[in-house]
């Protein structure tokens, strides 16, 4: 099915994307669970945008986040769509939703997923911040630098020598 989003033209296998979005495994860490429980209600426009691509807002493939003083900063939330990008805009899609200015990037960026095909693209949302709503202790402030080094190392991305020694 051909879907147009701003200047993007996408060939979406809607049936298989919906099936995948409902069935793939999701992370059970505390910060991700905090996102799952409030994302639908907090971001109705984003939820609608994603559903038009066969995606469920509360079932992303990958989330990068860190606990700040009294909220969680979700650096990125990535989803996988079965299909292809036929035509792409050189800019992201901007959306104001849930009191936040969100950036949405559609591309062929790799995120860990359980796809059984090479024909997929990703939808990644940036700039999400959410309060802690789970009835359990707020995560301790983690060492963000160490987390970033771990993340980049995990996905075979270069890390500068100065960062490795910190």
Give a label for each model feature.
Residues 1-52:
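N-terminal cysteine/histidine-rich coordination modules
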Residues 2-8, 79, 102-106, 161:
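Hydrophobic transmembrane signal anchors and adjacent membrane-proximal interface regions, especially
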Residues 5, 19, 40-48, 90, ...:
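Context-gated lysine
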Residues 19, 37, 53-58, 65-68, ...:
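Mitochondrial intermembrane space
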Residues 32-34, 84-88, 133:
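Generic structural motif
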Residues 42-44, 93-96, 136-138:
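Surface-exposed beta-strand edges and their flanking turn/coil or helix-capping segments
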Residues 60-124:
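Amphipathic protein-protein interaction modules
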Residues 109-166:
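Glycine-rich, aromatic-bearing surface loops/beta-hairpins
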């Amino acid at each position: 099915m051909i879907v147009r989003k701003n200047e993007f033209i996408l060939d979406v296998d809607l049936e298989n994307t919906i099936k995948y979005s409902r069935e793939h495994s999701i992370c059970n860490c505390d910060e991700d669970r905090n996102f799952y429980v409030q994302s639908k209600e907090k971001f109705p426009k984003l939820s609608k945008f994603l559903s038009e691509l066969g995606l469920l807002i509360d079932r992303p493939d990958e989330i990068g986040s860190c606990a700040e003083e009294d909220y969680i900063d979700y650096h990125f939330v990535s989803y996988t769509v079965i299909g292809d990008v036929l035509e792409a805009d050189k800019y992201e899609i901007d959306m104001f939703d849930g009191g936040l200015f969100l950036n949405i990037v559609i591309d062929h960026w790799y995120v860990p997923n359980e796809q059984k095909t090479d024909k997929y693209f990703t939808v990644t949302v940036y700039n999400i911040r959410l309060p802690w709503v789970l009835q359990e202790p707020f995560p301790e402030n983690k060492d963000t630098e160490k987390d970033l080094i771990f993340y980049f190392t995990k996905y075979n991305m270069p890390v500068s020598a100065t960062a490795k020694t910190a």
